[in-house]
Amino acid sequence: MAIISSLANQLLIAMPSLKDPNFERSVVYLCEHNEQGSVGLIINRPLQFPLSIVFEQLQIEPIRVEKNGLPLLFGGPVQPERGFVIHKQMGGWRSSLFLQDEVTVTTSNDIIRAIAYDEGPKDVLITLGYAAWTEQQLEREIMSNTWLVCPYKSEILYEVPFEERWEYAGLTLGIKMNQLSSDAGHA
């Protein structure tokens, strides 16, 4: 099977037929996609605990109490103890990967401290864990109608409420997700 042209910096939308609890109704930002596989972060699955838990673990006292309420997101089932901060490019963080004009992923604690002290990026998502696919696995899943591919839209990543992202991403493709059949077919 030939590799689909790179899907890096695009979004995956879970089809209604995907019932895996890790990915059901998920929207995934693809950070990397190449011959070796793919890596992405789920951007619409808030966890049951806020950022204050991370502040406590790192012994950080935020200067603004509302920072405690920032949600943590389930980024995927791989290494769920590992944090990833998705943000617009700014600052010189110790461990950042620039992906495109509006998306940088940082994994170092210095950005968490900056967020706590109101010196970090304004538009930010903080995820725990990530999603990964082996060589050709994502291509096979796309071909079997497990995922839709959606071009990156800044508003999906930073503005649309979490609970609306799945449906909204589909609408950007002209698709009402709740009207799709879970039965797949090929013409």
Swiss-Prot record:
The UniProt similarity line reads: Belongs to the UPF0301 (AlgH) family.
Species this protein is from = Legionella pneumophila (strain Lens)
Gene3D superfamilies tied to this protein: VC0467-like
Q: What is this protein called?
A: UPF0301 protein lpl0620
Residue spans making up a coiled coil are none
CC terms in the record's Gene Ontology section = cytosol
Name any one Pfam family assigned in the record: DUF179
**InterPro entries attached to this UniProt entry:** AlgH-like
| Domain of life of the native organism | Bacteria
